[in-house]
């Protein structure tokens, strides 16, 4: 029995060594696949960002290969970026502002879901920290995405809201001591009023309404 136990122990050790060898080989293949994919992903993200008013950006996806094996192989991956000419690439969290992060997340989501069978994309305030021309660029990008996939966007920016094919107004109320969230579709008149409210606040001026109409018409959403 003791001899059998020794034989079994040696057999298990051999199986372990073989499995470890195979795992290391697979991890090495995964490293190569990551490095290849990283180069392609860098180019695609930079192209997306150039369409979002970030045409000077440089992106590097760094694959750091260590010696400790984990469920993800030997690698750790960091996304590094330079948003200004002459500056080295640094980790996203140390470089990008709120508005830049919003656009980077939009670019990432658009690239990573391009080949996937995704029925709907939801963007919750993807426009945080942006305004003006950058907001218009984000609106155009969201509109382009929506031509391929159903897209739901929560926004407080009129430039982006005007790009939507359909508009839903979300409001909160308290009834009988309880909070309720109401969602209601809007016709043209309500769309103009709500976009005007985003432009001017609670007191809607005639100028704000005219501006809202112009935004809708420019986006091709006047009906």
Where are these regions (language model features)?
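GG-anchored amphipathic helix commonly corresponding to the ABC/SMC/Rad50 NBD signature/C-loop
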Residues: 78, 83-86, 101-121
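Flexible glycine-/small-residue-rich
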Residues: 61-65, 81-85, 108-110, 172, ...
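Walker B catalytic acidic pair
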Residues: 124-125
């Amino acid at each position: 029995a003791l001899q059998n136990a020794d034989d079994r122990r040696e057999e298990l050790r051999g199986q372990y060594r073989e499995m470890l060898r195979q795992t290391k080989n697979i991890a090495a293949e995964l490293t190569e696949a990551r490095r290849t994919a990283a180069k392609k992903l860098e180019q695609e993200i930079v192209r997306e960002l150039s369409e979002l008013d970030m045409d000077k950006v440089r992106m590097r996806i760094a694959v750091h290969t260590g010696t400790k094996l984990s469920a993800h192989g030997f690698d750790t991956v960091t996304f590094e970026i330079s948003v200004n000419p002459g500056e080295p690439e640094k980790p996203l969290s140390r470089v990008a502002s709120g508005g830049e992060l919003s656009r980077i997340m939009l670019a990432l989501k658009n690239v990573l879901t391009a080949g996937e069978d995704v029925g709907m994309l939801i963007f919750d305030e993807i426009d945080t920290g942006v305004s003006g021309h950058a907001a218009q660029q984000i609106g155009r990008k969201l509109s382009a995405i929506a031509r391929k996939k159903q897209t739901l966007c929560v926004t407080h920016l009129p430039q982006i809201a005007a790009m939507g094919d359909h508009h839903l107004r979300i409001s909160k109320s308290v009834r009988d001591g309880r909070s309720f969230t109401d969602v209601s579709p809007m016709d043209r008149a309500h769309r103009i009023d709500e976009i005007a409210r985003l432009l001017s606040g609670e007191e809607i001026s005639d100028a704000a309404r005219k501006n809202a109409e112009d935004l809708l018409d420019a986006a091709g959403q006047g009906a």
